[in-house]
Design a protein with these regions (language model features):
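C-terminal hydrophobic helical "lid"/dimerization subdomain
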Residues: 199-250
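Short helix-loop-beta connector
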Residues: 9, 39-44, 64-70, 134-136
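Glycine-rich phosphate-binding loop and adjacent beta-alpha segment
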Residues: 99, 108, 147-216
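Mid-domain Rossmann-like dinucleotide-binding core that forms the NAD(H)/NADP(H) cofactor-binding site
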Residues: 47-121
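Short amphipathic alpha-helix with an adjacent loop that forms part of the alpha/beta core around
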Residues: 123-134
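NAD(P)H cofactor-binding loop motif with strongest signal on the N-terminal glycine-rich segment
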Residues: 75-76, 144, 167
């Protein structure tokens, strides 16, 4: 504890994010930048609280989807996708979860995430329309790019908005101008954590901690490595098709 620091208490578990040099048994962090972790949250979940869950929540709030409305996202088996689906469910927002392989549907179901469809299967767009029962999809989160951007945009209802969050396909977005011109759909790139929304981060973190403590937010670790195996852990983190995060256990 630094001079003049009175909280958190010595021995209190905390979570921290955006710390340079954190691949170590010990590191320094500002007291104001750490979040106390309640006993109901284990270490595997606690180590993930300050990264993807916060990004997912801020993206959901930027989209402004209200309870009982529908949105759609791709890359739904990714950390952001799974977290957004769970947070949205807790808020009463319906999410269509698009995955790129059929096994991903079962992976999401094991976490209690429904409304999943594989874009590898023919006619998946028709299945999306059946899921929503004809209700308009008001927002989309695109983490892939390429042709999948246009696929999401096409499924949006009139006046719907698409947020581009990532570019897993490493390709430019391919969209139909007709969706933009005649159906008044639009899109923008996400730059979260700055501007007016930044002031809402403490409240968002509080909600994330609460959802994790109640089990409504499940954050899985596929494998934890000792620090001595950092190189192997880094290689494992780059492998596609993982079902959880790669972590260190000191």
């Amino acid at each position: 504890m630094g001079e003049g620091v009175t909280a958190p208490a010595v021995g209190q578990r905390v979570a921290a994010g955006s710390i340079v040099g954190a691949w170590a048994e010990y590191f320094l962090a500002r007291a104001a930048a750490v979040v106390p972790v309640p006993d109901a949250i284990d270490d595997d979940v606690a180590c993930q609280l300050m990264a993807m869950p916060l990004s997912a929540m801020m993206a959901l709030e930027e989209l402004g989807v209200r309870p009982d409305q529908w949105m759609i996202q791709n890359a739904a088996t990714g950390a952001v996708g799974k977290t957004l689906a769970m947070i949205a469910k807790a808020r009463g927002v319906h999410v269509v979860n698009v995955v790129r392989r059929s096994a991903g549907v079962a992976e999401l179901a094991a976490l209690g995430i429904g409304n999943a469809v594989s874009s590898a299967e023919a006619g998946w767009q028709k299945r999306v329309e059946a899921m929503t029962g004809g209700a308009p999809i008001v927002a989309a989160l695109d983490s892939v790019g390429g042709e999948e951007s246009g696929q999401l945009l096409h499924l949006l209802g009139e006046g719907g908005q698409l947020m581009t969050f990532g570019a897993m396909a490493n390709q430019p977005m391919i969209v139909d101008p007709g969706d933009l011109i005649f159906k008044r759909k639009g899109f923008w790139a996400a730059k979260l954590g700055s501007g007016p929304r930044r002031a809402e981060i403490p409240r968002a973190i509080g909600e994330i901690v609460r959802l994790a403590a109640t089990g409504e937010l499940k954050l899985t670790v596929e494998k934890a490595y000792p620090l001595e195996e950092a190189a192997e852990a880094a290689r494992a983190s780059m492998q596609p098709g993982r079902t959880g995060k790669i972590a260190f256990r000191a």
